[in-house]
């Protein structure tokens, strides 16, 4: 773990030097974990050169046990911070902060404390670093995929007509926890959140919501308007299981489609077409292939197959992507969309989910967490992809 943490800090320091930023202060819990191995509350001061210092306000004793960093100090007051930054990085003319997640009130506080320094947004640097997973991270993600597979294997035990969606979901959630799923699923975007994921049946599958994805679901109330609801699952219903498993912090996103009985012919055809698009995107991903090229290809194929209106959603609720990066957060880089032009490169991990919605009834397609190994995309999630009749 020490080698991993040192490598991450070293890479960020290289980027700080390139932009002539003397120091960065990391405060967001996921970024703290990435650079220290601990989520304990505090400030990680990373100078462009030299040793990083983890200033911890709570829990100091736990942080000392969790992090391999040698410079870990107790922060009794915010007033210590400017002095510690000076000791760690010298005179700071440019100070890097995670402006994509930092509350405005805290930004003004840092601005006042470091009045002589220009504040620079280092969020893009951090997100791009985290986009490329190391072999250490890939192995953790593979273990998360095993949890996902075992959870999906258990679906036929729990999926019964007459049960409510939320009851079925709770059984899968209980199993996932006992297999090692940490429970919490972290997202970085403002006001984006998810609890395990989306399990919906019948007409609820195409019930849209604020969630930035092709599906939403009613949830239990408008207070949390996504995911499984109170609907009773009926014989003949198509059931979507789109759940995230998180092992040692790392997300795996996987979707499979189930049916209580025989799937309708229209769904079978749409599912085969969605799988075809899925496989063609995987084949097309080579070193240097742009995210935008993969996205444009998928949307073009869907339109040619007759799904232009219902690929990745309907109307204004349509998702503009076919995949999203996964790691310590569910919404990482790269995003497989026409607007992003990152080239495929070793270490990229993302959830690939070209889906076709059949309004009011069902959804076709799967979601796999995939890894670009330097030559091509390989699937990390391993569960069978056909519609599973129960």
Label for each model-derived stretch:
Residues 1-390:
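Active-site neighborhoods and metal-handling regions in enzymes and metal-associated proteins
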């Amino acid at each position: 773990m020490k080698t991993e943490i040192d490598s991450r800090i070293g890479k960020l320091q290289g980027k700080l030097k390139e932009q002539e930023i003397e120091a960065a202060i990391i405060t967001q819990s996921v970024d703290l974990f990435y650079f220290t191995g601990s989520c304990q509350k505090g400030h990680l001061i990373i100078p462009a050169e030299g040793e990083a210092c983890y200033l911890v306000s709570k829990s100091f004793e736990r942080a000392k046990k969790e992090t391999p960093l040698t410079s870990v100090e107790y922060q009794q007051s915010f007033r210590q911070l400017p002095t510690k930054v000076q000791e760690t990085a010298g005179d700071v003319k440019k100070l890097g902060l995670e402006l994509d997640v930092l509350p405005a009130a805290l930004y003004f506080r840092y601005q006042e404390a470091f009045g002589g320094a220009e504040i620079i947004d280092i969020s893009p640097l951090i997100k791009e670093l985290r986009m490329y997973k190391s072999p250490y991270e890939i192995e953790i993600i593979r273990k998360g995929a095993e949890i996902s597979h075992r959870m999906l294997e258990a679906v036929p035990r729990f999926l019964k007509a007459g049960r409510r969606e939320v009851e079925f979901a709770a059984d899968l959630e209980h199993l996932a926890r006992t297999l090692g799923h940490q429970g919490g699923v972290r997202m970085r975007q403002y006001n984006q959140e998810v609890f395990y994921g989306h399990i919906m049946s019948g007409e609820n599958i195409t019930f849209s919501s604020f969630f930035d994805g092709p599906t939403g679901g009613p949830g239990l109330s408008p207070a949390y308007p996504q995911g499984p609801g109170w609907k009773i699952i009926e014989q003949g219903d198509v059931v979507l299981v789109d759940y995230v498993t998180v092992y040692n912090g790392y997300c795996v996103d996987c979707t499979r489609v189930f049916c209580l009985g025989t799937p309708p012919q229209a769904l079978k055809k749409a599912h085969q077409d969605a799988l075809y698009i899925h496989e063609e995107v995987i084949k097309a991903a080579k070193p240097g292939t742009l995210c935008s090229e993969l996205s444009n290809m998928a949307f073009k194929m869907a339109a040619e197959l007759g799904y232009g209106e219902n690929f990745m959603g309907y109307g204004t609720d349509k998702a503009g992507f076919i995949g999203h990066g996964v790691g310590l957060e569910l919404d990482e880089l790269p995003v497989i969309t026409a607007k992003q032009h990152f080239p495929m490169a070793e270490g990229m991990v993302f959830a690939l989910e070209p889906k076709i919605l059949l309004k009011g009834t069902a959804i076709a397609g799967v979601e796999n967490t995939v890894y670009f190994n330097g030559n091509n995309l390989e699937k990390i999630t391993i569960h069978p992809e056909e519609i599973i009749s129960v």
